[in-house]
Swiss-Prot record:
UniProt protein name: G2/mitotic-specific cyclin-B3
InterPro entries: Cyclin (IPR039361), Cyclin-like_dom (IPR013763), Cyclin-like_sf (IPR036915), Cyclin_C-dom (IPR004367), Cyclin_N (IPR006671)
Residues where Phosphoserine is found: S703
Superkingdom per UniProt: Eukaryota
Function description: Cyclins are positive regulatory subunits of the cyclin-dependent kinases (CDKs), and thereby play an essential role in the control of the cell cycle, notably via their destruction during cell division. Its tissue specificity suggest that it may be required during early meiotic prophase I.
Family affiliation: Belongs to the cyclin family. Cyclin AB subfamily.
Keyword list, A-Z: Cell cycle, Cell division, Cyclin, Meiosis, Nucleus, Phosphoprotein, Ubl conjugation
Species of origin: Mus musculus
Keyword Nucleus: yes
Primary location class: nucleus
Biological processes, Gene Ontology terms: cell division; meiotic cell cycle
Post-translational modification: Ubiquitinated. Ubiquitination leads to its degradation during anaphase entry, after degradation of CCNB1.
Length: 1396
């Protein structure tokens, strides 16, 4: 069917005639006008036609209902115009007809298809009147209309405004599918515009399809044939994508689009004036970003094609020249700068721009800046011209410009000079535009890791880096160092994988390119490290790019970009960059700075704040990267330990694990020492591309194993420092090993070359010897251990004197027997851990009977181990075997120690009162105070780090807190060990004073090892993961403190409550075996006293709470807060009974009767919905439960006495909540907030008047007892755990929504809820106590208990889920997920309670 005509057909036809009459002079004039002014791009007749076309397009885009059917004659006329143009030739005739074709902006589906075909071939051929011939010939026309296209772009964009663009966008979607030339697209649009009048309706249909086809663009762009034109296609894509956005911003974009018309051909000229438009565009980054991301998707689909286009730089450059026709020469010059000046943050454009390393770094955002600076320049004007669609045109232009810029690096340097001053202007805009782009591209990167993805990823990365770049440029502008910052700009630009590919193609010193790329990736990745999406994506593109244009060696080198803090020769220039980065992002940028020298120093200074200098020795370079990775390696420390061999290559997926990267860096450095062939070029970075892949990889794995373990085993180094008797050799060795990181690259090479083999040999020895030092320290330098082996016997004797537990002896003997079967590497480890266990048990049991026997066994074991370790030292087993054996032994002895620690926990959880009393007596308060002071001195510097350690326990984290303890001094562990020994020695009675002194002198290393081992093992336990390094040092110390507090509180409680012991909770405290009390509550007094007795000490938060978690059992995790706050005189249990007796009397006054029958418009379901909403409000405002219960009670009391309309029910709920909040809350929400939660449906006067009415109805007596008050009372009486209390609250709160429970007394409802909670928690033995304190017998409660259990069983059928969801959260112990009792089980329990 012939498509309907657009409205005002006659006008359109006249416009066609007028446009056909246009002369070449007019075209030239219009072009000139377009250059100078986008407002007037054609003659008066053309402007009129443009206006008419705009109206037509508006009608079309808006899907105006007035659409006429166009006759076939119109189609014939259009075809004739096309044929005439083709016959006249590619020159003036085509241009004239194209101008005349302004009239027909809308193309039919067939026309669009033909246009697509036209776009494909760029050969100049004549079009036939027939559509098929047009289809073929139009393909030929693409090259012909070079100048035509410019005019077309001008006129079409101007005339079409964004409406035509919408149409064009619709068309371009298909065009994009078949052709990817913006120029072709424009020419076809011109021709199709003539033809399209009859086919407008179909075009409208295609618009919808085209919108859909935005997705198609990706598939369409996949065709590599149009790579050269691809940039045009990309521009078209943005046009399509921006259609929706343009509809919104059609007015502004229309102004610019008129100037956009020639952006491909004459964009350079027309952008002079639209600088303001550029600003507007930049201010409209959402448009750019939207279609950018879409284009990126398409680009990802067609990534190879895009890369090929970039490869065909010359062809693309020539094509833009041909397409642009007259302006081709100008563009050549312009594109040189435009490549840099591509402000358009199109990810693709950026990718292309990024690829020219030298041109792109500054040019990308700098030229936009320069363009803004000097809009007079064509280049600037061009960018301003496309700025309307900066993303549309920029990618294409950028491709060509980048290519040209590659060919013309000199102007890029000039551009750089321009960029620095201008950078400040555009940086903000680009940052704004790019930020969203970054958000979108990151997921795209994840989704697509194709080689094109590099481009896209690099674009996204570049966008991120570009965001930083403008900052850098700002810095540079302020610093006025543009010339010196050019290389720095390159690293800051972080030449994306796209640049990498270009560099590869350019073959410009591929090593430098790789290094630069890796640095760029490093910087970008580091900057992106905050967003964890990018690390993986960055690594993958690096791998892809490296595979393409780089050897596997270099590829691997890039795989460890994080390890590469520096880039060979460019590291110096990079060193210049980091200052700017630091100024921009301070510590983060410092960490991210890729410079080797600066990062070493700065990273050390920063990392010293977080770790030991020993650790700095290992991670000097990665130190810069480590600050960021710290949280992540804490999170994922275990995998590195286990996968030290494998993950190191793969660690790039987790580049932020600083220790991994550091170990890898060290390994690379060591490899560089071993393999000197490839290191010459990477000497500064100490990164070898691994010339001998096999040998180097083996060495690399070994070194990685060593050094990762060393990272995790800083304790060995610490021990080395601790045992200063033998440290001299170890220090020299370690410094030789790790001073390389601090030394300059050249010095490092020389030193490493000389020492490489020796270091590897020493590392092997150290690995074999020192696996015993710590569970996580196979690499611990064993020279101190070996030298101290002679002293180990003495240390064993001293330790045996200190260890007085018979359990310790038994366990030690058993462990030693098992250890004899294992290799000597495991013996010292297990012995050390056993010694710690023995110390802990001795401290708990305090039994001195087995001192001699234990000492003998311990000494023998230590001697045997010393001999075996010496023999090991001579034999020096292979590193891999040693590591495997050490791992297996660690696992075995870890499992054994787990059982031992569990036994200790059991002992500590259930100490007899006598033993506690003895411990308290043996440990005078003076010793405790001294210990606490020492502990505080140790803990003050590591509290935050320990908290993170506890949250994320792992083998690495075990080492980390230790190192964190030694922030200020390298030998902090050495000092900590004496303090630890003091704490252990003070804990036993005075008899241990001498032993303590001996331990200070000789046993420092031994205790250190024990502590470290127990620390490593303790975190494998669920309950014991609270045993941090300091906790282990002060384990018994905390125990004693708790015991001391226990006795104080116990005596106080007993004195205060002796007269009322039967009526308060402390009756159970006097008798640990009381039947009233749960069996697990025996140690509750410590829990009760601990929170507030030690609250004045900072020791509480770090150690006291941990001790509580260890000693308290399942049902006594913590008590009710009110009971913990027993010091409050208002909550004193002496008055508790009288207070609640008063409340029980008072509740009689506020009993609610069923009132729903008296309500005209309300139902029980409405009430349930309202209460459910109130529960949600309580959680949103974080108000107390008392407020919620009181609000519901006030509402029921009011509705019992007054009528309420349906439309005022929400107002009633909000008002009652406000009244309750004023009564219960310390800081109640304001009236406006309560109106806001009602969505401002009511006026302030309405709520005030209703509040007055409610208070008057209740006689202003709102101190109403609620079930929640009684629940708290009952929980305090029976010492229920918070979990049990929370479960009872959940049961009781479920009744708030149920209308049938409003008649129940609050005290009775609370009692039934609590009894059901006890049954559900298997605490039926507490029911008699509850009956006593509540005053209700089971005979009175069993019916209500059954109803409540039925309610819980059928809660899943309820539509109202707020209560259930609330108590399903972890903050409420997920009590809602506890399965309710079956009917039969409940009956059995109730029968037992009733008849026994």
């Amino acid at each position: 069917m012939p498509p309907p005509l657009l409205p005002k057909r006659s006008k359109l036809e006249t416009e066609k005639a007028q446009s056909n009459k246009i002369t070449p002079r007019e075209e030239q004039q219009s072009e000139k006008i377009g250059k100078s002014n986008h407002a007037a791009s054609s003659s008066s007749s053309s402007t009129q036609g443009a206006v008419k076309r705009r109206s037509v397009f508006e009608d079309v885009t808006n899907a105006s209902h007035s659409q006429c059917v166009q006759s076939k004659e119109d189609n014939i006329e259009l075809k004739s115009h096309v044929s005439k143009r083709t016959k006249k030739g590619v020159g003036e005739v085509t241009q004239k007809k194209i101008k005349s074709s302004k009239m027909g902006h809308v193309t039919s589906l067939s026309n669009m298809e033909k246009e697509f075909i036209l776009d494909i071939p760029n050969k100049p051929k004549t079009l036939t009147t027939e559509e098929p011939s047009v289809f073929q010939k139009t393909l030929v026309l693409n090259e012909e209309p070079a100048t035509k296209e410019t005019c077309l772009m001008r006129k079409t964009l101007k005339s079409c405004a964004f409406h035509q663009e919408t149409l064009l966008m619709e068309k371009p979607l298909t065009l994009l599918v078949e052709t990817e030339d913006y120029n072709e697209f424009d020419t076809e649009l011109m021709t199709s515009k003539k033809k399209d009048k009859p086919e407008d309706p179909t075009i409208i249909e295609e618009m919808t399809d085209l919108k859909k086809s935005v997705i198609r663009k990706v598939t369409l762009t996949s065709s590599p044939l149009w790579l050269k034109n691809k940039h045009v296609v990309q521009e078209e894509k943005p046009v399509i994508q921006e259609k929706s956005s343009f509809k919104r911003i059609s007015l502004v974009s229309n102004v610019v689009t008129t100037k956009e018309k020639p952006p491909v051909k004459k964009p350079h000229f027309r952008k002079k004036k639209p600088t303001t438009e550029m600003k507007s565009l930049l201010q409209e980054p959402s448009l750019e970003e939207k279609y950018n991301t879409q284009e990126d998707a398409s680009i990802l689909k067609k990534p190879q094609v895009l890369q090929e286009n970039t490869n065909n730089k010359d062809a693309t450059l020539t094509e833009p020249v041909t397409f642009k026709g007259k302006h081709s020469a100008n563009e050549a010059t312009h594109t040189k700068k435009p490549s840099s000046s591509k402000n358009n943050p199109d990810p693709q454009g950026k990718g292309t721009n990024l690829r020219p390393l030298r041109v792109h770094p500054v040019t990308y955002e700098n030229e936009p800046m320069s363009s803004k600076k000097s809009t007079t320049k064509k280049k600037d004007s061009h960018f301003h011209g496309p700025s309307v669609l900066p993303d549309k045109h920029s990618p294409q232009m950028e491709v060509s410009t980048v290519k040209k810029s590659l060919a013309l690096p000199n102007p890029t340097t000039e551009e750089k000079m321009l960029h620095f001053p201008v950078a400040t202007v555009l940086e903000k805009q680009h940052n704004m535009g790019e930020a969203p782009c970054l958000k979108k591209p990151s997921p795209l990167r994840k989704q697509q890791q194709l080689p094109k993805r590099r481009r896209f990823f690099s674009n996204s990365a570049v966008q991120e880096t570009v965001i930083r770049k403008p900052l850098f440029f700002k810095m540079s502008t302020t610093e006025k160092d543009p010339p010196s910052q050019w290389p720095s700009a390159l690293p800051k630009k972080h030449i994306s994988p796209g640049e990498l590919s270009k560099q590869k193609k350019q073959h410009v010193s591929p090593k430098h390119n790789m290094e630069e790329d890796s640095q760029c990736w490093l910087d970008s990745a580091f900057k992106k490290q905050l967003s964890r999406e990018e690390p993986a994506s960055t690594h993958t593109p690096l791998k892809l790019e490296m595979q393409q244009a780089i050897t596997k060696e270099t590829g691997f080198h890039l795989r460890n970009p994080l390890v590469l803090p520096t880039v060979t020769s460019e590291a110096k220039s990079l060193t210049k960059e980091p200052p700017s980065f630091r100024e921009q992002n301070t510590s983060l940028l410092k960490r991210k700075s890729t410079t080797h020298t600066i990062t070493l120093q700065q990273a050390q200074s920063e990392w010293q704040e977080m770790t030991d200098e020993d650790r700095n020795l290992f991670s000097i370079k990665p130190g810069s990267h480590r600050k960021e990775p710290i949280p992540e390696f804490l999170q994922n420390p275990l995998p590195p330990n286990e996968n030290c061999l494998i993950s190191q290559k793969l660690s790039h997926s987790m580049p932020f694990a600083s220790q991994k990267t550091t170990s890898q860096e060290r390994a690379h450095r060591k490899e560089s020492v071993a393999s000197n062939d490839d290191k010459n070029f990477f000497s500064q970075d100490l990164f070898s591309p691994f010339s001998s892949a096999d040998e180097d990889t083996l060495k690399f794995h070994k070194s990685l194993d060593f050094q990762e373990q060393v990272d995790r085993k800083n304790d060995s180094h610490k021990k080395m420092f601790d045992s200063q008797d033998s440290v001299s050799e170890e220090e020299s060795f370690l410094r030789k090993l790790f001073c390389k990181d601090r030394c300059s690259s050249t010095e490092e090479l020389s030193q490493e070359r000389t020492v490489a083999l020796e270091q590897e040999f020493l590392l092997i020895k150290i690995l074999n010897e020192n696996t015993s030092s710590d569970v996580d320290e196979p690499l611990s330098h064993q020279s101190p251990h070996i030298q101290n082996h002679s002293d180990t016997t003495k240390e064993a004797l001293e330790a045996s004197e200190a260890l007085e537990a018979p359990e310790a002896l038994e366990t030690l003997e058993a462990l030693v027997a098992s250890e004899d079967l294992e290799e000597p590497l495991n013996i010292l480890e297990e012995l050390s851990t056993e010694n710690m266990v023995a110390l802990m048990k001795m401290l708990v049991t305090e039994d001195e009977s087995t001192k001699d026997s234990f000492s003998g066994n311990y000494t023998a074991a230590r001697e045997a181990h010393a001999e075996k370790s010496l023999s090991l030292e001579e034999t020096s087993i292979n590193e891999a075997a040693t590591l495997k054996e050490s791992l297996s032994s660690q696992e075995k002895h870890r499992a054994e120690l787990v059982t031992v620690l569990k036994e200790l926990l059991v002992l500590m959880k259930n100490p007899s009162l006598k033993r506690v009393a003895l411990a308290f007596q043996e440990n005078p308060s003076n010793n405790v105070e001294t210990l606490l002071r020492e502990v505080l001195a140790l803990v003050e510097n590591s509290t935050a780090d320990e908290s993170t350690l506890q949250e994320k326990p792992s083998t690495k984290t075990d080492v980390t807190p230790k190192e964190l303890l030694a922030l200020e001094e390298n030998s902090s562990n050495k000092k900590a060990n004496p303090m630890d020994s003091l704490s252990f020695d003070h804990k036993p009675d005075t008899e241990m004073g001498e032993i303590a002194r001996m331990v200070l002198t000789d046993e420092e290393y031994n205790i250190d090892t024990l502590y470290e081992r127990v620390l490593a093992l303790s975190q494998g336990l669920i309950a014991a993961d609270q045993l941090s390094f300091t906790d282990l040092q002060n384990f018994e110390e905390t125990k004693i403190v708790d015991e001391e507090e226990f006795f104080k509180s116990f005596l106080v409680f007993e004195n205060k409550n002796s007269p009322n012991m039967s009526s308060n909770a402390f009756e159970s405290r006097t008798d640990n075996s009381s039947a009233i009390m749960p069996s697990s509550k025996a140690f509750n007094p410590v829990e009760n006293s601990n929170p507030y007795v030690s609250s004045s000490k900072s020791f509480k938060s770090t150690l006291g709470a941990k001790e509580t978690e260890i000693t308290i059992q399942d049902d006594s995790d913590s008590l009710e807060r009110i009971e913990k706050e027993g010091q409050d005189p208002l909550l004193n249990t002496i008055y508790a009974k009288d207070v609640f007796n008063y409340l029980k009397e008072r509740e009689e006054k506020f009993l609610v009767q069923k009132y729903m029958d008296g309500q005209m418009e309300l139902t029980s379901d409405m009430r349930a919905i309202l209460v459910d909403w109130l529960v949600e409000i309580q959680g949103s405002f974080q108000m107390t439960h008392e407020t919620l219960y009181l609000a519901v009670k006030i509402m029921d009391l009011y509705l019992m006495k007054a009528q309420c309309k349906k439309n005022h029910l929400q107002l009633l709920g909000s008002t009652t909540y406000m009244i309750a909040a004023k009564f219960e809350e310390s800081y109640p929400p304001s009236l406006s907030e309560f109106l806001f939660i009602c969505e401002d449906m009511y006026e302030k006067s309405d709520m005030v008047s209703l509040e007055s009415s409610i208070l008057q109805t209740l006689n202003f007596d709102i101190n109403i007892p609620t079930a929640y008050n009684f629940l708290r009372r009952y929980a305090s009486c029976i010492h229920a755990s918070m979990k049990t209390l929370t479960l009872s609250r959940f049961i009781c709160e479920m009744t708030l929504q149920e209308y049938e429970y409003i008649e129940e007394r609050p005290s009775k409802l609370a009692a039934a809820s609590f009894i059901l909670a006890l049954y559900m928690r298997n605490l039926s033995n507490c029911v008699p106590t509850l009956e006593y304190f509540t005053g209700y017998k089971m005979a009175e409660l069993h019916i209500l208990v059954r109803k409540l259990n039925h309610l819980l069983n059928f809660r899943s059928h309820s539509i109202l889920k707020n209560v259930f969801e609330k108590y399903s959260e972890e903050t409420y112990f997920e009590v809602a997920k506890i399965p309710p009792l079956s009917k039969q089980d409940l009956e059995n329990l109730l029968n037992c309670a009733l008849f026994h």
